[in-house]
Design a protein with these regions (language model features):
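S-adenosylmethionine-dependent methyltransferases
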Residues: 1-136
Length: 136
């Protein structure tokens, strides 16, 4: 992890803004995630490290459930050219996902849905389902 004084850091090539970064503070004044999507959880780093070591198949179609800020999915796009759909029950997390996608120069799709409401239609084109820190 490379840290600097600009309130951001990189993890395996993915730029992440800290909660104290002015853009995150601005979003927090407008969008207030109701569940646990108010920060990046450490389990995201573990999942990203696993993908980097296991060499995730390039161009995979991935759904990230309980995405929060979407950092694991963004890492898959950035490092493996994956096509990622970020799913969360709390739509207030999507501005954070979109900001991180923008600063990493990648594109992800966002879908507001509870995990229990996902159905075959949502998953028919997906190859891999990922999630970190989603069992609480």
């Amino acid at each position: 992890m490379i840290k600097n004084r600009e309130k951001d850091f990189k993890h395996n090539g993915v730029k992440v803004l800290r909660s104290s970064h002015r853009d995150i503070r601005r979003l927090k004044n407008i969008y207030k995630p109701a569940l646990h999507g108010f920060r990046v959880w450490p389990s995201s780093w573990l999942l990203i490290d696993y993908f980097m070591r296991s060499r995730l198949k390039p161009n995979s179609r991935i759904v990230e459930v309980g995405c929060g800020w979407g950092i694991a999915g963004i890492s898959c796009v950035k490092n493996f050219n994956s096509v990622v759909t970020c799913v969360d029950s709390d739509s207030a997390v999507f501005p954070y996902v979109n900001l991180h996608a923008k600063i990493n120069d990648v594109t992800v799709t966002t879908v507001q849905s509870d995990f229990n409401d996902l159905c075959e239609n949502n998953m028919k084109n997906m190859e891999i389902m990922i999630g970190s820190d989603i069992c609480f």
